[in-house]
């Protein structure tokens, strides 16, 4: 068995990596492709991979095809970074993220060229992961690229949650709202998905390129209006929405469209799987883990305060329990918070803002002297920074102050990165090639230093059972 970390920070880092490894896109896709019946493995196959996990997913898909003695008919990989093409028939394009740009436009155009070569009787593997919306962004209809990109930028600071943002973005996107499935029809489509949205809503993941759009123009109008964005929209977007409100034939593709009759969709990795992996690993460290949900949402700073209050409550319960608990509490959440930006803001991401807010609460809350919290994106990037998130303790807030920064001011101005960097609290992992939203882990105390507390038969059986559940899904 691997060595158990000696302190809470090291334990949290190990738990983060347990989550990331559990949702490795390549292994997850291989498990899904192995379920394809032998009699269905004879079609001509195209590979379209879009998202942060596009490279490992495409590489696995091509490896499986080779094992089936098949050669890909063609395809494209659209990812945040360019790598060598894994096969001569498959091209590679780098898109822009988190805000789309010229490379995104080019990638979207190349997807169209690949889709135009697909014929009836062919099969297309659409491999989708987080970031797809931005990486392959191009406008639909009369909307100009600069108008689409400005909308994306405004949405990031609007306070709308990720599901609402996706509903709006795909309305104006060339490949969103089921339009890729329409372009590929009548070919058979196998859509394999690494979910990066709360609730694993297929229509929201990557703007739902192969899924009917459940929203209506009236719904989009209402959301834009409530966020104060409707009056800022360019005329082309207003006309698109208003026209569909008046004439249903101008709506986005809906359920019942013939294009979706030959589409099969499967989520192969999700935040829930990542949280289960954290839970299983935490038990081997001697913690009493509890998964408190995969739907964490709301303003990051407010959520950070709330989670520390929850941690205090559980730590008190476990410390006073007579039921044989170790007193080493581990609380686990998944999801994606938001940050509503003002006119002027600094550097950081939602996980860093949550962590900085939590650091203040830890410093001001009695009874949490050994507590620590990690908030990080499973993709290895939090906002437009080089950090995945941060790990904070009771001492983080004072360390920032001693370094000459005002953490209260930084928190209020959404400038969490410099404060956390000054305290050495940032978690830098580089890109992980997966994305199942964020994970937040809070612990009371370091891991157990007693091997018996770390891995009892009950703990081992629970970990094995969790692994078996994931394999069966």
Task: Show which residues each predicted segment covers.
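An N-terminal, well-structured beta->alpha segment
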Residues: 1-48, 56-57
């Amino acid at each position: 068995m691997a060595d158990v970390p000696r302190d809470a920070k090291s334990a949290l880092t190990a738990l983060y990596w347990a989550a990331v490894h559990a949702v490795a896109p390549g292994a997850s896709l291989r498990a899904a492709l192995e379920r394809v019946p032998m009699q269905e493995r004879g079609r001509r196959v195209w590979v379209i991979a879009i998202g942060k996990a596009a490279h490992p997913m495409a590489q696995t898909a091509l490896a499986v095809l080779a094992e089936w003695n098949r050669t890909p008919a063609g395809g494209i990989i659209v990812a945040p970074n360019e790598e060598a093409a894994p096969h001569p028939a498959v091209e590679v394009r780098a898109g822009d993220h988190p805000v789309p740009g010229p490379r995104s436009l080019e990638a979207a155009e190349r997807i169209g060229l690949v889709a135009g070569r697909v014929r009836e009787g062919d099969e297309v593997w659409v491999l989708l992961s987080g970031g797809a919306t931005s990486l392959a962004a191009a406008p639909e209809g009369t909307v100009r690229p600069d108008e689409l990109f400005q909308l994306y930028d405004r949405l990031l600071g609007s306070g709308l949650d990720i599901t609402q943002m996706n509903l709006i973005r795909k309305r104006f996107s060339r490949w969103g709202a089921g339009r890729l499935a329409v372009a590929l029809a009548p070919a058979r489509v196998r859509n394999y998905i690494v979910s990066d949205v709360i609730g694993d809503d297929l229509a929201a993941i990557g703007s739902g390129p192969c899924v009917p759009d459940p929203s209506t123009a009236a719904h989009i109008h209402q959301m834009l209006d409530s966020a104060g964005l409707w009056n800022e929209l360019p005329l082309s977007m207003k006309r698109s929405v208003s026209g569909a409100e008046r004439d249903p034939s101008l709506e986005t593709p809906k359920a019942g469209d013939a294009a979706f009759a030959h589409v099969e969709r499967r989520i192969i990795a999700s935040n829930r799987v990542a949280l289960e992996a954290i839970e299983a690993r935490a038990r081997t460290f001697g913690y009493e883990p509890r998964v408190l949900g995969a739907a964490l949402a709301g303003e990051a700073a407010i959520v950070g305060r709330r989670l520390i209050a929850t941690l205090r409550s559980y730590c008190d319960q476990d410390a006073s329990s007579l039921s044989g608990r170790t007193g080493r509490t581990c609380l686990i959440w998944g999801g994606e918070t938001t940050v509503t930006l003002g006119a002027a803001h600094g550097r950081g991401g939602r996980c860093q803002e949550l962590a900085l807010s939590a650091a203040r609460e830890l410093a001001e809350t009695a009874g949490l002297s050994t507590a620590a919290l990690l908030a990080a994106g499973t993709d290895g990037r939090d906002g437009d920074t080089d950090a995945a998130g941060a790990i904070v303790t009771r001492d983080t807030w004072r360390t920032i102050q001693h370094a000459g920064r005002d953490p209260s001011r930084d928190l209020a101005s959404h400038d969490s990165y410099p404060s956390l960097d000054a305290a050495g609290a940032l978690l830098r992992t580089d890109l992980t090639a997966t994305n199942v939203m964020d994970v937040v882990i809070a612990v009371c105390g370091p891991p157990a230093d007693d091997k018996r507390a770390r891995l009892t038969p009950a703990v081992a059986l629970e970990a094995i059972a969790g692994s078996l559940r994931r394999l069966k899904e």
